[in-house]
Amino acid sequence: MNIKIDASRVAGLITGSANLDKVVYDTWYLKDVELMSGKIYGLVSEYGQGCMYLSYLLGGKIDFGDLQIFIDGINVSKEDLKSISWNLEPSKEKYKNKTVRKSIEKSIIKNKCSDTFEDIVEAFYLDERRHDIKLQYLSGERWRASAALGYVSGKSIFYAPYKNTSFYHSMYGSNMFKALRYLADKGTIIVLPVGSDTFIKSVVDECIYLDPVYEQ
């Protein structure tokens, strides 16, 4: 899968702004972007300078305006993106109150997934002691469990809210990146918004830099 964001038709206003998660206001200085399946991307910008905007744009959460987005050469809509995307952070999503086991087992059946629950537990490093806990109440395992649910739901794009470098560094020892690599190897796209490339560049396939360039 190849995703192209075309900003060439944007006239006048060069920025896109949006209220995200009701607490974050983010502005992206629009530019062309291309992403390929099978990769984990770090979306790098200062807080409020576009990394979360682009993440949620790919998640089908933001109106395109004059932007055009193409998947494998086909012009797609916000709803098209929403139907194939999955938020790694469940706390703002409808599935936050679902338990790990029941939600995954139901989705396996609904989507006729060839994997068993045991396969998913192994692939995403899910702790059996937390199988009956609601996703929003998980701590270090929350993103892995959400990723597992998105995977068995057949999603192709996995996006996330802004997190700082220390968050990703702490998650490195929790098997989160092993789970995300499993997703990427299955042909999905993962985007991780962060304020600096200090650590993230060592664990993702590519960084996309979004901070505006200021003339001096």
Predicted features along the sequence, with ranges:
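Conserved switch/coupling elements of ABC/ABC-like ATPase nucleotide-binding domains
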Residues: 208-216
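ABC ATPase nucleotide-binding domain signature region
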Residues: 36-111
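Glycine-rich phosphate-binding loops of nucleotide-dependent enzymes
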Residues: 44-45, 55, 63, 149-155, ...
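Conserved ABC nucleotide-binding domain
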Residues: 120-139, 154
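GG-anchored amphipathic helix commonly corresponding to the ABC/SMC/Rad50 NBD signature/C-loop
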Residues: 139-162
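A short, flexible loop at the N-terminus of ABC-type nucleotide-binding domains that lies
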Residues: 1-32, 36-37, 63
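ABC ATPase nucleotide-binding domain helical subdomain, centered on the C-loop/LSGGQ "ABC signature"
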Residues: 105-124
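Conserved catalytic loops of ABC-family nucleotide-binding domains
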Residues: 38, 153-158, 165-201, 206
